[in-house]
């Protein structure tokens, strides 16, 4: 490999939603950084089969408010 063109690849700690931790190598952050997951295979609907709507911080309401007038144009 050519030197100086590749990102730093180092060990980080990943914390799953249930608190379990594991070490992996990544370009994320700095050496020894911690990556805390909001959604992982143990809690994601695609892998658990449980369908749930997650509206974090009212994002759907904010979208609806912002674009409420679009498409209601009269001639």
Curated annotation (Swiss-Prot):
One of its GO terms (molecular function) is structural constituent of ribosome. InterPro entries: Ribosomal_bL28/bL31-like_sf (IPR034704), Ribosomal_bL31 (IPR002150), Ribosomal_bL31_A (IPR027491), Ribosomal_bL31_sf (IPR042105). Keywords: Ribonucleoprotein, Ribosomal protein, RNA-binding, rRNA-binding. It comes from the Bacteria. One of its GO terms (biological process) is translation. PROSITE patterns: RIBOSOMAL_L31 (PS01143). The keyword Cytoplasm does not apply. It holds the Pfam family Ribosomal_L31. GO terms for cellular component: ribonucleoprotein complex; ribosome. Gene3D superfamilies: Ribosomal protein L31. Binds the 23S rRNA. PANTHER family: 50S RIBOSOMAL PROTEIN L31, CHLOROPLASTIC, LARGE RIBOSOMAL SUBUNIT PROTEIN BL31A. NCBIfam families: L31, PRK00528.1. Part of the 50S ribosomal subunit. Belongs to the bacterial ribosomal protein bL31 family. Type A subfamily. This is Large ribosomal subunit protein bL31.
